[in-house]
Every structure is written in C-alpha cells, then in structure tokens.
From Swiss-Prot:
Family matches, as Gene3D superfamilies: P-loop containing nucleotide triphosphate hydrolases, Tandem AAA-ATPase domain, Zinc/RING finger domain, C3HC4 (zinc finger)
InterPro entries xref list: Helicase_ATP-bd (IPR014001), Helicase_C-like (IPR001650), P-loop_NTPase (IPR027417), SNF2-like_sf (IPR038718), SNF2/RAD54-like_C (IPR049730), SNF2_N (IPR000330), SNF2_RAD54_helicase_TF (IPR050628), Znf_C3HC4_RING-type (IPR018957)
Keywords on record: ATP-binding, Helicase, Hydrolase, Metal-binding, Nucleotide-binding, Nucleus, Zinc, Zinc-finger
The family this protein is said to belong to: Belongs to the SNF2/RAD54 helicase family.
Domain Helicase C-terminal: 866-1032
Gene Ontology MF terms: ATP binding; ATP hydrolysis activity; ATP-dependent activity, acting on DNA; ATP-dependent protein-DNA complex displacement activity; helicase activity; ubiquitin protein ligase activity; zinc ion binding
Organism: Schizosaccharomyces pombe (strain 972 / ATCC 24843) (Fission yeast)
GO terms for cellular component: chromatin; cytoplasm; nucleus
EC number: 3.6.4.-
Ranges for domain Helicase ATP-binding: 403-588
Protein name: Uncharacterized ATP-dependent helicase C23E6.02
Length: 1040
C-alpha cells in the first residue's frame, strides 16, 4: 500500500483560508454560517450566498478529485512512471477543469535554475494545483519563461518597465501568486527593502509567517518545467489567473425543453464551475459532484489571455502539432488557446460558433418523438414494386427511413438485430423514394465482398420487374467502367470496401502530386469520388469502425444526397468506433472528432460518473439510430416468436499434466506483463500480449495448438534460405512500415489477431483465414468465368498475390532483426514452449515431418480434456435425439480438425465449414448438412460462421472456447436460432476451471451488463479494446 502522507498535507481547504468577499468584508462565523453584520447590500449578500454554495461544491469536487488520485495510487507502485501514468489518467477525466494533478518536486534536490531533471530524485510525490476560489480575479497576462537562464523575476520585471514602482510591485505580486495556486503562501510587496524575499501566509489575514521566496519559486519553476518537457517546448506559456470573473448581474439561463434535454445557452470558459455535473449542452464538463441539477448560470464572464494552457490532462503525443491540428485532451495553436471543443475563448467570433452548435443540436434532436410511428392504423403498407409483403416492424422501419431522409439529417443508422430484414427495408426505401433527377439518380451500395452476390440476388428477387433497377457490380475482373459518368448511368452500383479503399489511396497520391507540383506518373480516373451519388448505403457498416483506415476515410469522402448505415453491431471495439459512422453520415456537431471525443469518448471511457455523458450518448442514438431485437414488441407482440433458447455452461478441470503446462505458460506470461507494466510499454507491446493470451487460450483446448505450425515447419537450412529469399523481396519502404506497426490488425476483417501472413512484395498483411478466403474466391471466379488468368489480389493495393511468396510475421521479425514476439530471456519463446509440452503430447515434435497432417492421423492423434467433454456431449445428443443436428464452433480451425479423428472412430458423420474452403465447397457443405439426415455435426470456425448463414436445420450449438466479444458468439448462435427454426435451441459452452477462460467469461458478463443497462434493450454491441486493467485481469494478476 502506498503512503500518501506527503500528498495529503497539500489538501486544499480554502473554506478556512480565503475570505469570501474581500471587497465587502463579508465572511463566515466560526460555525460556518454567513455573517450579515456588514453594511453590504442585499445584492451583495445574495452573491455571497451563491458564491458560498458554489465554493462548497468546488471544494467537494477538488477533494473527490484528489481522493480519486489516491485511489489510483493505492495498489500501484510508487515509481515515477506509475505516478505519471496515474496523473495523466486523473487529469484526463476532467478536461475542462482548470485544476491539475502535477508532480511535486523534492525541494532539497532543486536548484534555482530552470533545468530541472525528470527523474525519481527530483520528483517524489504529487500535488493538486487549483485556482483561488470565491474571489474576483483580475485578467492578468501570461508570462513566458525563457529556459536560457533568465530568472522569473527578471522576466516579470522586463514586462513592467513602463509602470510606476508601485504599479510594478503590485503586478509582480499578482503575477507571482498566479503561478502556483494551491499553496497557502501569497507573495506580497514588502515595506522594507531588506524584507523583499519574504511572504505571508493566508491562513489568516493577520498572520505574517515568513517563508523563503526562493524555495517557493523553485517549486513553481519545477512544475512549469515538467509541463514544458511534456510539450517539448523551448519555453513554457505559464498558467495565467484566467477564469470566469463574474459581474454583479445574475440571471437564470434560458433553456428549451426537447423531451428531457436541457439546452443551456451558456458560454463555456476555462473554469465554468457552475456546470460541474455535466448536464445540459455538450459544453458541460463531467464531475464527481453529488449535485443533480444545475440551476445557476452567470453571464458576462471575463476570459484570460491568449497564451494559456488548459491543464486538463498531459498530452499523449509529445510532439508539437501543426497549427490547427486537434489533440486528445488539449488543443494547441501558435497564437491563441482554444478550448476542448475548438471554441476560441478570446475571439469575438466565439458566440457565433456556439450559436451554430446550438442550432446543430436543436436540428439533431428535432422531432425525436415523431420519428417512430407505433400506431398501426396510420402505418403505411408494402410499397408497390416490392414483391414480399413487409412485416409490421419493417413497415414501421420504412416510415422511419423515409422520415429521416425528409429531415435535415438525410440519413441514419438502421441497426436492427440480425434476421429482421435490414436489406428488404433498404430496398423498400429505394422503391418508395426514387430519384427525381435523371442526372443524380444512382444509389451506391458498399458491402463486404462476401455479400456482393447476395445483394444482387436480393435486388433481382425482391423488386418487381416493373420497378426493377439497372444494376452494375464493380469488383475484381468485372470492373469494366472507369469513369463516373458510366457508373451514374445505372440505378444501383454494387461495390466493396476494398475498392473504395484502393481508389481513396489513388486519390491521395494524385492530390499529393498536385500539391507538390510533381509530375503524375499515371493518370487514373477516380469514378467514385468524381460521381455525385443520390444515395450511399454502407452494409455491415461496422467495417469502417476504425476511422483511420483507407476504407473509412474513403467512404466519408463520397458525395451523396442521402447516406445510410446498415449494421446489427454498429460498435464492437469502443465508443470511438461509432464516431466513424457519425462522420460518414455528416451528423453535426458530432461529425467533428473534437466534439465527439470530448462529449463521449473521453468521459465514457473513464468508467467514473458516466451517467450524464451516457444520457447524452443515448440521445444521439435516439436521434439517428433505429434498433429492434427479436424480443422487441410491436402491437403488443414480439416481432418474432421463436422456440426457446437454453444456454448451459459446462465447467471442467484440466488434467494434471495439462494444468501443469498451463500454469507454466501463465507464470511466464505474467512475468512479461509485469515487465511491460513497469516499463509503461503496454500499448507498444499490445500485439505481443495478444500472442501470450492466445497461447493461454489454446492451452485450454489442446497443447498441440501452441506449437502446431512451428512443429510443422522444416527448420533446416533450405527452409531458412527459401524464406529469407522471400523476405528480401519485400519492398524496402514496406519493411520500414512493418517495423513500425504496433497492433496486428488484419487489413480485411479489421480484427486484431496474433498470427498474420505478409504478402510479398507489397508488405500488406492478412490473417490466415482472410488470406485463404481471398485466394479461394479468386479460384472460384476463375472457374466461373473459365478465365485461368484471374489471380488473387491484395485487398489494400490490389497487387497480385503469389501464394508461393507469403511470409509469417514471426519470421519477418526474425529476418528484419527485430526482437522476438516475446523477449529472448523469456521462457515463452517457441522452442522453450516445445520443451514444456507434457509427455503424452510430445509426439507432435517427434513426428514433425508429418506437418499438420498429424492432427488428423489416428496413429499419432492425442485427445484432450475439452475434446472428451465435447465428444461425450455429442454422443449424448445423438443417443437421445437421433434426428437433431449439432453445430460446433471454435476460433481455432486446427482444434476443429482434431475432432475429425474421434468422429470417424465413433462413426459420427460430420462436415467442416471454414475459411479455407472455396465458396463452392462451403455452399456444398451447407447443402449436404441440411439435406443429408446422416450428417449430424458441422464443425465451423467462429469467423467463417458468425455472419450470413442460415443453419436452422441444427438446434444444438457447442461453443468450445469463449471469445472476448460475447456478441460475436451470439451472432454465431443466431445462425440456428432465427426465422425457420421450429425446435428448442440448446447451447453448451465448455469452460475450463481456474484458467483464462473463466476470466474471459467474467469480462463478457461485465461488458454485457454495462452496455445493456446503459444503452437500453440489448444495447449496442460495444466491447472495448482490452485496456491495461483488463489485460492484468486476463493474465490472472488482479481480481477485477
């Protein structure tokens, strides 16, 4: 436990130290009741009461902020890195508050110069720096401290040369005091020349305790220098005494009621402590305050100087940004300061900017209650031209779609649960609202490549011939049109996210050539960005969840009248991913990242007092998103009435040898995790940590999974020579790019994975399953068109893929001289793990010449605890329900392959469905599974089977290993539990005790509870990228 004594002695308690109104001599009696004995006017007394109320709230807030920091430090080490990390964390929670936690220097180690070193001997603790409370403060210009050796006093003196001696002394006093707001010492101008280095304390107006001014200045300079080091500034703009200064006028804020939203017309300032709770407009900061309502707003506030830093969190990027570029918590401009939303505090234009945002918010929340029509008597029927009859919830959805297109939003997000007919509702909209102009008539539909043909079939089968649009598919070898006019001659154009990403990349290259006045090597038309679309529809819109990808940036750049997102899971990896959809839809003001992150991303990621920002977020969702689940009721009845679904968790213990192997792996992983924690390098080693977690999860299934591919490798000289030759063919710029990647994210499915394959020579990478899918899809196309020249292409740059020139990321690290995926001194390197294998599993090493074939060879095959558990469950189902079919899901294809041996031995007929099969093979497997009564089991990989399949012929689901995101599992289960299912569905989750799997399930439960309770019925499917606490929990290093 950390000793916080040094920190606690800096506790701010200005109630006892600051008179409330120095001008009017109004203060408090000893029992803290107002003293009305003075001759102050009633207005002044009213102001005194209000100031006292606000001061008490402010003090309570600061105490909570300090207590929060103590709580962060409670279970932490006392190292400088840990302290800095916790300081950044706490400061980041309150970006609009002008108090700040800062490092407190050890005065014995300080010298009077500005060159304070950032090391443990200099900084020993932390301190809370806060402005004076309850006093009107003058608007004093900030001081710039030059680090070339000029002293603070010389700097101040140089700015007061033109003033009289008394004016200069007074200004020196004010400026010096303004620099360090939290201490009890105030610098005053001494009456005697020999006493000018003394100060008096303000614990009492009559006390004159002497404190050495030099020590105080050293402390101030140490704090400022630490900020300068964080910013890498040659000089530091000092914190000024800026903040709201209230006049005698007092008024309640005007506000408008829009349902339960209060839109306060207020000006956000550096310190707006009238809105600590954070309700009302997006301007309001979050707080730990217990206050529920904010009734009072002061007008006519005064602002500080241009050169100020809002101390609302340390910068994540230590480099100075370019002018006008936004940062995470803080925005820095060369000539002036802007607040977190980008409003210029010292510009006369400020009010206009806020008025514009107020109008944008009013437009966003306009007519919320009228958007959904629940009255069946006024609900429109199936539109002419649509073949299927719409279900009632689809009719309701169509009216919502039409209403949003007719509003200022001109689009939104249809987020109905899987199987509720998002596609048919979108087609109904196309039929109902055709374009009025022939020049702008084309609807662009962007979809994953696997759904292209499905969309085409839906259009042909769902829209009547009398209304049927002309359709063009722009993908692969079928891309016959190169200019915008050709595309715009069709009613509907179907394409993929990869095509948009590729064209956006070309656009960036073209724009750069124009900017640099460089010769253009090859002119290419950019038809998607040159066209003016009537409507753009993103199917599986979560594909653009990462706002920085080429696909996301390209989609946002498309020009269209109407814009729609279709997605059953609009968020999967954090609130910030929802921003990408909002940006595409151009929903103001939140299409601006600074506004979105300030109002939602930062406060919702803090997990502290998220009630107010969550309410605002739900308001945003209600304004632009429609979501119904299978259990949603319409006209008093559920949308769908399905057979019951029963989920059972089957817990099992690993065998003693399996558990010994697992514990050894976990111990090594914990050592590595602690090392990254101590170094503060969790983010940069995120990929390595995923590998460690992957190995723990694999060990719960079967020890072979960990060393399977390594054991299958012929690690002789010829193998090394061949792969090094492949490595040498990677473009040099690609090698440099690969060395800098921090997160192993597949460029096609966007999942963060532990195993990537690098395409040579372009250096782009895919996960093994996606790469296999790209190759097999190309082979399918070649067969369908009888064109043997069709070859697979990279999904990023569309360079041809040579299947003989693929390199694993692990080998790339070896050949490029990078460190192994874990450190060389760690026991978790592959060769060491192989030595740790229990004896009964070591035959995979002894028979490495068999490669992956050993997984399906009965002579060498070895079972595991989890295989036996699943096998017994399958046999029990077959015995009791001889006609039922079973789906078995796993994230690991090689684990599914291990089941083929016992199934053959037991005479259980099965089929496989993985990304490694061609499209034709997968389709045939589904047909055979449905029509052949003898086929009882379908072994299916989680990635291949969680979208786009109808498997209602099965009513038993076995999940072999839990996934981080519970909603991915639920999507897989819904392959069986959907329209067409006529039997009860039984789900069996096999979990090993005392392993990472228990912690994954606990993490799932916490996430599900948080999301479903916060975002309503079933909620949106948001699972955060694993943070440090979650990683520690998964490695078994913390209890929660």
């Amino acid at each position: 436990m950390r000793n916080n004594t040094a920190f606690e002695q800096f506790t701010l308690n200005p109630c006892e130290q600051i008179p409330l109104d120095d001008k009017h001599n109004i203060g408090f009696n000893k029992n803290n009741t107002p003293d009305y004995s003075s001759s102050a006017s009633s207005d002044q007394l009213l102001k005194n009461d209000i100031n006292r109320h606000e001061m008490e709230r402010r003090i309570a807030f600061l105490n909570r902020k300090q207590a929060l920091f103590n709580a962060f430090m409670h279970d932490s080490s006392s190292s400088l890195n840990t302290m800095e990390s916790n300081i950044e964390k706490v400061n980041g929670l309150f970006p609009n508050d002008n108090s700040v936690i800062a490092l407190k220097p050890n005065e014995e180690k300080l010298n009077s110069s500005l060159s304070v070193e950032n090391n443990d001997s200099t900084y020993t603790d932390a301190t809370l720096i806060a402005p004076k409370i309850g006093l009107d403060r003058p608007n004093i210009n900030a001081i710039t401290i030059d680090v070339d050796g000029h002293s603070l006093q010389n700097e101040i003196s140089s700015s007061t040369d033109k003033l009289s001696p008394s004016q200069s002394d007074a200004l020196f006093e004010q400026k010096q005091d303004s620099l360090f707001w939290n201490d009890n010492a105030v610098i005053v101008v001494s009456d005697s020349e020999s006493d000018d280095n003394n100060v008096r304390t303000k614990s009492s107006l009559n006390d004159h305790d002497k404190v050495n001014m030099k020590e105080k200045r050293n402390l101030e300079l140490a704090f400022m220098n630490s900020k300068r080091k964080k910013l890498e500034l040659p000089s530091l703009p000092v914190l000024s005494t800026a903040g709201p200064s209230y006049t005698n006028s007092l008024a309640l804020p005007p506000f408008h009621h829009h349902n339960n939203y209060k839109m306060f017309n207020t000006t956000h300032t550096l310190e707006d402590d009238k809105f600590l709770q954070g309700k009302g407009t997006s301007n309001n900061p979050i707080s730990l305050s217990d206050e529920e309502d904010n009734e009072i707003n002061f007008q006519n506030k005064r602002y500080g100087s241009d050169s100020v830093i809002l101390p609302g969190g340390l910068l994540h990027d230590s480099k100075l940004p370019e002018p006008g570029k936004h940062l995470f918590h803080l925005q820095w401009y060369h000539d002036r300061f802007h607040n977190i939303e980008g409003f210029n505090l010292s510009d006369s234009n400020n009010q206009k900017v806020q008025d514009d945002q107020q109008q944008q918010l009013e437009e966003l929340f306009k007519d919320l209650d009228e958007q959904l029509v629940n009255d069946p008597t006024i609900r429109e029927g199936t539109p002419a031209g649509l073949i299927p009859t719409l279900m009632e919830h689809q009719k309701e959805g169509l009216m919502w779609l039409k209403r949003l297109e007719e509003s200022s939003k001109k689009g939104g997000i249809l987020a109905d649960d899987m199987g509720l007919g998002k596609t048919v509702q979108a087609l109904a909209l196309l039929v109902t609202r055709p374009p009025e102009s022939k020049s702008v008539k084309t609807t662009l539909i962007i979809t994953p490549v696997s759904l292209l043909q499905q969309w085409h079939n839906e259009i042909l089968t769902k829209i009547a011939p009398s209304h049927r649009p002309t359709v063009y598919i722009h993908h692969g070898s079928s891309k016959k049109h190169k200019i915008a006019e050709q595309l715009m001659s069709y009613d509907i154009v179907l394409t993929t996210y990869n095509v948009i990403a590729y064209e956006f990349k070309n656009k960036m290259a073209y724009d750069k050539s124009i900017e640099d006045n460089a010769p253009i090597k090859k002119f290419e038309h950019l038809p998607f960005f040159e066209a003016e679309w009537y409507r753009v529809i993103l199917d599986e819109a979560q594909t653009i969840k990462n706002r920085n990808t080429l696909a996301a940036r390209g989609c946002c750049l498309l020009e269209s009248t109407y814009r729609w997102c279709l997605s059953g899971t609009p968020m999967q990896n954090g609130v910030e991913e929802f921003y990408s959809l909002i940006k595409f839809l151009r929903i103001k003001p939140y299409s601006d990242w600074s506004s979105f992150s300030k109002d939602f991303t930062i406060p919702l990621s803090s997990n502290i007092n998220t009630s107010a920002p969550m309410k605002r977020f739900r308001g945003l969702l209600k304004a632009v998103l429609l979501r119904r689940t299978k259990n949603t009721k319409i006209d008093g009845k559920p949308i769908l009435t399905l057979p019951p679904k029963t989920a059972v968790k089957s817990e099992t213990d690993l065998s003693s040898s399996e558990m010994e192997f697992y514990n050894t792996l976990q111990s090594g992983a914990q050592i590595q995790m602690r090392k990254y924690l101590q170094e503060g390098t969790i983010t940069t080693h995120y990929g390595s940590l995923l590998v460690l977690l992957l190995r723990l999860r694999q060990a719960c299934c079967h020890p072979w999974l960990i060393v399977a591919r390594e054991a299958a490798v012929d690690d002789n000289d010829s193998f090394q020579a061949k792969n090094r030759a492949i490595y040498n063919q990677i473009y040099p710029e690609a090698v440099n790019r690969l060395k800098l990647i921090e997160t192993l994210q597949c460029s096609l499915c966007m999942d963060v994975v532990a195993e990537l394959l690098i395409i040579v020579p372009c250096g782009h990478f895919l996960c093994r399953e996606c790469l296999t899918h790209v190759i097999t899809s190309s082979e399918d196309m070649a067969k369908q068109t009888s064109n043997e020249n069709i070859s697979p292409k990279c999904s990023v740059c569309e360079e041809y893929i040579d299947t003989e020139r693929l390199l694993s990321y692990a080998l790339f690290r070896r050949y490029s001289g990078m460190a192994p995926i874990v450190d060389a001194d760690n026991k978790l390197r592959t060769e060491n793990i192989s030595e740790l294998l229990p004896k009964q599993y070591s035959n995979i090493l002894e028979n490495r010449q068999m490669g992956m074939k050993i997984f399906t060879d009965p002579k060498h095959w070895t079972t595991s605890t989890k295989i036996e558990k699943a096998l017994n469950a399958v046999k029990e189902i077959i015995k009791k329900q001889p006609t039922d079919k079973i789906l078995i899901f796993s994230q690991f294809v090689s684990f599914l392959e291990l089941f083929t041996v016992p199934f053959r031995q037991e005479g259980i007929k099965y089929l496989m469905y993985t990304g490694g099969l061609s499209t034709a093979e997968r389709n045939q497997a589904l047909i055979n599974f449905e029509v052949d009564p003898n086929v009882r089991v379908l072994l299916i990989s989680l990635k291949a089977g969680n979208v786009g399949l109808n498997l209602t012929c099965a009513n038993h689901v076995i999940i072999l290993d839990p996934f981080w995101n519970p909603y991915i599992e639920e999507q897989a289960v819904d392959r069986a539990h959907r329209i067409g299912q006529d039997k009860p569905v039984n789900i069996l989750r096999i979990v090993t005790n005392n392993t990472i799997e228990e912690r994954v399930l606990a993490l799932q439960d916490r996430k599900r509870e948080l999301i479903d309770s916060a975002l309503g019925e079933k909620g949106l499917r948001e699972i955060s990228r694993l943070n440090t606490k979650e990683l520690s929990f998964l490695f078994g290093m913390s209890s929660r």
